[in-house]
Every structure is written in C-alpha cells, then in structure tokens.
C-alpha cells in the first residue's frame, strides 16, 4: 500500500493515468486498477472504518497499487471536482485498460468508478457497502466491459449516488499532486 505525501523535500509524485491497450485476456491476477483512497475527514466515523479496512484491497489484489492520499492531497483533488465535496471518504478505482471493441465507442470517456462512502452516516452501513464494493470488484475484475457491469449493478441496487462511472476524468483531474 502506498502513502503519498510531499514531506521531507521529496519531489511531488505525478500520476500518468492513461489507459493502456490490452493484448492478453484478463485474468484474476492481471493488474487492472489503481486504487485511490480520497478522504478529507468530513465523516470521521466512516473514515475510520475505511482506513481500518482498506488494506483488504491490497490483500485481495496485491498486483493493484493502493494509494492512500493525505488530507491535503484529497482537498486538492476535490477542488478540481467540487461536486464531490462532502461525499468522501471515497474509493476511486481507476481502470488501467481501455474497453475493447464496441464498448469503447459507447463509453469513450470511461476511466473507472468510485464508491462515495461519505453519503453514509452509519459506520456499520458504510462497512457493509465497502464489503459489497469489494465483492463487486472481485466478481467483475475480468469483465471486458466493466462500465456495463457497473451500470447493471446500479440498476440492480438503485445506488446511483453511491457508485458512479468516471466518464469525464482527465489527466488533470486525476493529477494527484
């Protein structure tokens, strides 16, 4: 798990989040995501639950880097996407592969998805949603059209404000410090 901060005079890390083309089929062991934990501290009880359980993402998928952003980094990111202020803590799952074939034409700006835990006030409910989220990622990490699976899950669960497809993410909006 990576903790990104800019203390001690180290140069600021810059993420080059550009989707890759994939030649091989996806497997459960294929690196698929960059996982970002964004948390400004608005919802302390839910933040505590997430921070206690986010290591599970790394345990389930050590091939996917997990970045725990500092409060300052989280604020800087949310300044670029103010519509998400107050919805953190959130887990951003950046998909490193472009969708193949027709799906890339249907969703040309697809970049991944996120779980907005800040809209939940009860820590136990947040933990249950985090567990469902990890189960969703586990079941669908080899899907050719992950955005289709997200849409299907949204329709099934009716959680349109909980898990959202990141359609308009640009390098600048995900340039995290």
Located regions from the model:
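Charge-rich, solvent-exposed alpha-helical interaction surfaces
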Residues: 36, 49, 77, 126-136, ...
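A short acidic (Asp/Glu
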Residues: 45-50, 77-80, 102-104
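Local sequence-structure signature of Cys/Sec-based thiol-disulfide redox active-site neighborhoods
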Residues: 1-67, 71-73
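Ser/Thr/Gly-rich flexible loops in soluble cytosolic domains mediating phosphotransfer, phosphorylation
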Residues: 108-148
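Exposed regions on extracellular, virion, or secretory-pathway luminal proteins
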Residues: 71-77, 97
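A short, hydrophobic beta-strand/beta-hairpin element that forms part of a small beta-sheet core
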Residues: 80-109
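Membrane-inserting effector segments that mediate pore formation, membrane fusion
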Residues: 144-177
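Hydrophobic beta-strand residues in large extracellular and virion-surface proteins
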Residues: 35, 66-68, 91-93, 115, ...
